[in-house]
Curated annotation (Swiss-Prot):
It comes from Escherichia coli O157:H7. This is Ribosomal RNA small subunit methyltransferase A. S-adenosyl-L-methionine binds at N18, L20, G45, E66, D91, N113. It is found in: Cytoplasm. Belongs to the class I-like SAM-binding methyltransferase superfamily. rRNA adenine N(6)-methyltransferase family. RsmA subfamily. NCBIfam families: ksgA. It comes from the Bacteria. The gene is rsmA. Its EC number is 2.1.1.182. Specifically dimethylates two adjacent adenosines (A1518 and A1519) in the loop of a conserved hairpin near the 3'-end of 16S rRNA in the 30S particle. May play a critical role in biogenesis of 30S subunits.
Length: 273
């Protein structure tokens, strides 16, 4: 039997499709999301409706974003969900979540079992809309969740950690084995909750500068920042900020990256390349 076929649908590798089918895991995720009537609930990649059905049962209206034309068509004719659903058959990577929040008149509660092949770039896309989002619950590759929650001085800590924690409070929810999916992925999975900060703990003047600094630092993570960021900061400037130039990218805290970004924004304003 082809284990890529589930409920009559052939999982498509190009969309990174792995369908959740473990009822205990599904119930645990829905409990963590805790959807309530009247909230602007949005699901990314509903697939075969493993989460859509139990979430939709609790709601009068649910918005879903599904790239796969066949799956979007299945949802339109769903026996009890169909009338409740607003379906956008498009790519979440280019979706305007700000416009949707404005249309719905409130911040969005976003959730989904994200395709692992686009999960990291999709997270960065969503971070640009955190002022329009109340919270997010996602099933991701466990390694990605580890990176999201990692602190300084750990191997998992990287640019994704810094940017996620700049925008959100990041909370791991539960771990999920490959056996919970059809077809089973080759990696472990985990669910994470991301809640955008109501008040930024480390505000930056220009987030593009923070993005640039973290990109340059972590692209050369084995180098000391004296070398990896030497084109942006002198040793004297780093020392003046209380940052040891002999540290590496993984040793610098989110607060320190934000401090560096604000210095650079004030002294060398961002130029579009």
């Amino acid at each position: 039997m082809n284990n890529r076929v589930h409920q009559g649908h052939l999982a498509r590798k190009r969309f990174g499709q792995n369908f959740l089918n473990d009822q205990f895991v599904i119930d645990s995720i829905v409990s963590a999301i805790n959807p309530q009537k009247g909230q602007a609930m949005v699901e990314i990649g509903p697939g075969l409706a493993a989460l859509t059905e139990p979430v939709g049962e609790r709601l009068d209206q649910l918005t879903v974003i599904e790239l796969d034309r066949d799956l979007a068509a299945r949802l339109q004719t769903h026996p009890f969900l169909g009338p409740k659903l607003t379906i956008y058959q498009q790519d979440a990577m280019t979706f305007n979540f700000g416009e949707l929040a404005e249309k719905m008149g409130q911040p969005l509660r976003v959730f989904g079992n994200l395709p692992y092949n686009i999960s990291t770039p999709l997270m960065f896309h969503l971070f640009s809309y955190t002022d329009a989002i109340a919270d997010m619950h996602f099933m991701l590759q466990k390694e990605v969740v580890n990176r999201l929650v990692a602190g300084p001085n750990s191997k998992a800590y990287g640019r994704l950690s810094v940017m996620a924690q700049y925008y959100c409070n990041v909370i791991p929810v539960l771990e999920v084995p490959p056996s919970a999916f059809t077809p089973p992925p080759k990696v472990d999975s985990a669910v994470v909750r991301l809640v955008p900060h109501a008040t930024m703990p480390h505000p930056v003047k220009d987030v593009r500068v923070l993005s640039r600094i973290t990109t340059e630092a972590f692209n050369q993570r084995r180098k000391t920042i004296r070398n990896s960021l030497g084109n942006l900061f002198s040793v004297e400037v780093l020392t003046g900020m209380g940052i040891d130039p002999a540290m590496r990218a993984e040793n610098i805290s989110v607060a320190q990256y934000c401090q560096m970004a604000n210095y650079l924004a004030e002294n060398a304003p961002f130029q579009e390349s």
